[in-house]
Amino acid sequence: LTAHYFMKQGLNCVLVEKNQIAHQSTAASTAILQYEIDLGLNRLMSMVGEQNAQHAFLFGYQAVMEMSQIVKEINSNCDFTFKPCFLYTQDPRKVDYMADECKSRQAIGIHCELFTSETHQNEFSFNFEVGVYSHYGAAIINPVQFTRDLIEYNVKKGVQVFENTNIVDYNLSSRQSVLITEQEFTITADKVIICTGYDALEWFKHEKPFYTLSRSFAVLTKPVENFHGWKEACIIRDDQDPYTYIRPTLSNSIIIGGEDLEIDDLDGEVANMGDRHPLALQQYHQLLRRVRRMFPQIENIKTDCWFHGLFVDTKDGLPFIGKHPDYPGAYFNLGYGSNGMLYSLIGAKLISQDVAGKNPKELEIFKFNRY
């Protein structure tokens, strides 16, 4: 996405990938495109200020629409489909909180409404007390196909792409930077944009951690015959911490994710567990039991596959986008949090504008030293 936006700005760029394109976290993504931010709008306003929080939510809301435009532009066959989304609670003490949250979102132009158990319980087979049902601002996508189509489109537009190319050394400068590959080739650039997700944490080992790490789990079911008890097969998320999310696929399967485990030690068991680790299996089975309980009218919910991955989160649920004082000549586009794909799009847009000399003031919202 960053290379795409640089190309759109008329900037000459080279894309370098240590592994294979569309592997690693892209292949493991559940690919929920949703404007939702973990803290919710009201809590985020109390942390970063009313204007910044509103802008952050609207950025995500608009990014879903912008992603659909990119899909059309590159003619991608990636199953992009708009979906409504439902954030709910089963806690009766949170009725007023959810009502206020819904009003705050409506006030900035988000098309949502408050669902209560009295008005809409018959549209869902699981119990809830109250929830915010958003009619727009969410979608599902095939991330691997989208990435492949995006790369192919940009290569045709002149972007150079090198995969299986590991950068092992660098000399960053505000004037010109040099990157050195494992094969001892050099790349000279006016600006370097680091978009390496979890791997980018290596750049900040000397700092006090500004993030938290966890391992998140997901189960993909085999196709089911229907989505009874599931209004519009919307994207569903509860208000727990960690939360559980559920989405359909276009092949009538279900993806359920959550049951996150915190990582306190990078050398510990949770940080390095394999796919068949007993604790991982426990989390998968818990997710499967949960989706069966929530949708008793959907018969024969069976596992097709499961997977887990590392998840990087931030204190306010927002990404880190922009410059860092320790690395002149570089920008970071780090979509940490629950909206990795949308945050990456937002970062790509803002950074490309900044490099092109347009100085977008919105970068202030996502800067490194904001807390």
Which residues are covered by each model-predicted region?
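Glycine-rich phosphate/pyrophosphate-binding beta-alpha loops
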Residues: 27-30, 138, 237, 241-243, ...
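Short beta-strand to alpha-helix junction loop
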Residues: 58-61, 88-97, 133-153, 162, ...
